[in-house]
Amino acid sequence: MTYREVFGVVLLSAASALAPVWADNFDYDTRRAPALLVCDRDSEHGRVAAARTCYQALLRSTRDGLVRAEAQWALGDVKSANDEFRALVNADARALQPRLRWGRLFLATHQYADAVKLFQEALAIDAQDKGARLAMARVMAERYDGDVRKLLATLLEEDPTLIEGQLLMARVELENGKYDAAATAAAQALKLAEQQQRAPLEAWSQLAAIELARGADTQRWTGPALAYNPRYGDIFASLAHFEVMRRRYLEASVWLRQAVQVQPDLWTAHEELGVNQLRLGDREGARVALTRAYSGDPFSATTVNTLRLLDSLEQFNFERMTQPDAIMQLHKKESAALRPYVEQLMRESMATFGKRYGYTPNEPVTVELYPDHDDFAVRIAGLPGIGLLGVTFGHLVAMDSPSGRQTGEFHWGSTLWHEMAHVYTLSVTDHRVPRWLSEGISVFEEWRTGPTPGVSLAPPVLTAFAEGKFLPVAQLDEGFIRPSYPEQVQVSYMQAGLICLFIEERWGFDKLASFLRQFTRDNNTAAAVQANFAMEPAAFDKEFTASVQKRFAPYLADPKKWLPTMQRAAKALEARDWKEASSASQQAVALLPEFTPADSPYLMLAKAQEGAGDSAAATATLLAWRKAGGWDPDGLRWLAKLLLQAQRPVEATAVLDAVNYADPLRAPGHAELGELLLTAGKAQEAVREYSVLLALDPLDTAAANFGLARAWRLAGDLPQSRRRLLEALETAPNYRPAQKLLLEMTGDPTP
């Protein structure tokens, strides 16, 4: 069976694997059957043959369905275990433990929805069951979803002897950069494991990861772990996980190679190695590791999907730029249409950030654009984040192409600019920069130097600020990694951007650049703030809060006023009450001029002004909207139309050019822009627009070729011009404009 044939197959419907497929399954629940614990001892010490014999003997000797299911799971016979768990649950509506363990089986295969359903059923049976609550905490921890720390704190306050609770708390604290708290929890887990005679391996893994984060020697903990179980590769896979969390992908691959060397049948580590090599741009290395993972676990969705993604790369063009050195991976169906704009943004961003941050890439920067969002989702598998538009792995950027989302859903040019900033902030600091600062600088650069000018944000960000939900600067990473409320990730992005803006306005850009350089060595935010700004983090937070309060004072004076004002404007527009619509829209703009999306009050105001017959006022409003950061493609096209009506072609040209970085794959705009560029004598830009127009396969190819012929003639390339004229006439032999120009060129060899 090939991986293409099993795509979409649910793992739990697989045939018997009878081999270790996932990382070790440790069950710390005191309700685990003593007979299983005997076999577990052999498994935990790496005595594979003895463990197999023990579990097989249990299957022959017991009729206890739960014990049988656990033994089948331990032997890798997932299908039989799944069937056994199902039978137990179907036989007893109040069977709590079978539900929990069945859910854990789903959790081990990353089928979170099925796992959560079973855990919720268990909680419905007993809302206070610690095993069920711990299971939900593990789901939250693995999915980076919800305030898992609060849940764990409650559980551990009730029962501090929960080994898994201490381990999860250690993981969460470590991911939040709280190394002392993580070490305390991990040490407690180790102590409890010894007291309860359970395997200390996961506790050693956590302690090793903490040592790694502190820059210390992990051998202190990996040594005892391998002495306890010479085949315990998961300790190295755990170290790799935390390196990935820190975006240190090269280091992660080193640990993953150790993991599979120690435990060759740890298929999850082979899989993660393959995924990680792809993050590093090593497609062949990725394929080797993923093929190995597939040989042991042909039903992993991540393995199968990533192998299919690698196969699909034959549908892409890989185009090399020079000066600067860069590679564009663009799908063949849209490569010709997108390349000019991608290349321009890459050149501009690399020149801009190279100067601002004092770094020249030492290897080619690669940008990958995916027209199928599902492919992009596979590309970033295993990373925390919600609704990501792009990701950066060092010198490699992957993102949705403009066709990967609905028109107007995202500004692909700003996304690319944002991600290119990450290339520089990560590289300057050798990936040590905190997530919040790297994201903050990227947002800040969108506002300051990117293709959409202006500081643009939405009311929920300021509402969160007003409610005291902005995090202290020293804790801001937590808002990205483990959000405690639904909007916190987006709020944290904006808070980070506003902090960078505050630094620039308070001390100047050079101080922001020097703050970034505080992380060229291992450092934390609190120490970096003290060193760079000569103030305690609390004092920094106080000044930043005051700056936000001042900048957004009109909105923050009464956060509940803005929405009713917007609703009043919308209602008046619908009633064609232009005066009331204008008044309400102006009030909404004044309250929050930074709100610039497609439903912004600027656009409502412009509609009201145009409805009242004042096109000049509508034009001025739309120009203000664009300056503030507005980029909705329909709004920009409307602005260009008004500018042309007002005989302002230069400004209209700039606006239509801006549309290309929001919505470049619609043909009509390129013809209009091409004509304006020809009129302005901008030959190369006109060549670009008509070339893109032809790549989009317009209905009137004769007119497009004619436009391109005129552009080439203006550029002085007469052979290209004649070639395009002949193309136009081949499509439409009676196309008089092309006939006329060809006659002119035949008689006059000069442009």
Per-region residue spans from a language model:
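Register position in tetratricopeptide repeats
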Residues: E44, A74, A108-T109, A141-R143, ...
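Long, contiguous interaction/recruitment modules in multidomain scaffold/adaptor proteins
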Residues: S16-T30, E44, E175, G408-H411, ...
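Helix-start (N-cap) detector for alpha-helical repeat units in TPR-like alpha-solenoids
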Residues: R32, T62-L66, L96-Q97, K130-G131, ...
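Residue-level recognition of tetratricopeptide repeat
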Residues: D40, E70, R104, R138, ...
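Canonical tetratricopeptide repeat
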Residues: V67, R101, A135, L168, ...
